[in-house]
Amino acid sequence: MSNTKVYLAPMEGLTDYMFRNAFDEFFGHGKIDKYFMPFISPNQTEKFLAKEMRDIDRNNNLINSLPQIMTNTPDFIWTAHMLFDNFGYNEINLNAGCPSGTVVSKSKGSGMLADTDRLERILYEIMSDNYIQDNNIKVSVKTRIGIESPDEWYNILEVYNKFSLEELFIHP
C-alpha cells in the first residue's frame, strides 16, 4: 500500500472552486488528497473579498480544499479564526513559497524567507495562538529552499524545525 499523497496546487485566477469541483468530478475521482485554494491575503478591513468568500465557502467546495494564507505579519490570525469559525476548516497553509515579483517585493510569499527572524516570529504567533491550539488547528507551510540561493535552506529549515507543522511543502 502506498503512502503517496497527491495535491493540486493553485493557479491564481484559474483554480477557483468551480475548477476544483469539476476537476475532481472528471479527473480526480477522489484520487486527489487536497486541493489548495488560491491564496487569501489578509487586509486592514478584516473582511474577505467577494471572490474570496465564494472560493472559501464550504457549500462551494465538494472536495477536500485547503485555504492558503499569504501575509508578512502575524496580524492575519483573525483570518484564520474566521476560516474556522465561519467555514469549518481545520487546517491552514501559510504561503512562504510564491516567487512572483509583486508578492516578493511586499515581503510575502518567498519574500518572507529573506528575514528568517520575522518568519520565526510569524510562525510563533500562529502556533502559540490560543484559538489555534484549543481547536487543534493544523498549520502547514509551502516554502522554497531559499530566495537567492539554495544555501539559505539550512537556516530556513532551522526555523521550521522549531514548530510542529502538519506538513512542509517545497515549492520548486
Where are these regions (language model features)?
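Glycine-rich, positively charged N-terminal anion/phosphate-binding segment
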Residues: 11-86
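Aromatic- and acidic-residue-enriched carbohydrate-binding clefts of CAZyme catalytic domains
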Residues: 113-114
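Short, flexible active-site loop motifs that bind/organize anionic cofactors or intermediates
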Residues: 9-10, 109
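Hydrophobic faces of well-ordered beta-strands that scaffold small-molecule active sites
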Residues: 6-9, 35-38, 65-69, 92-94, ...
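N-terminal targeting peptides
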Residues: 1-3
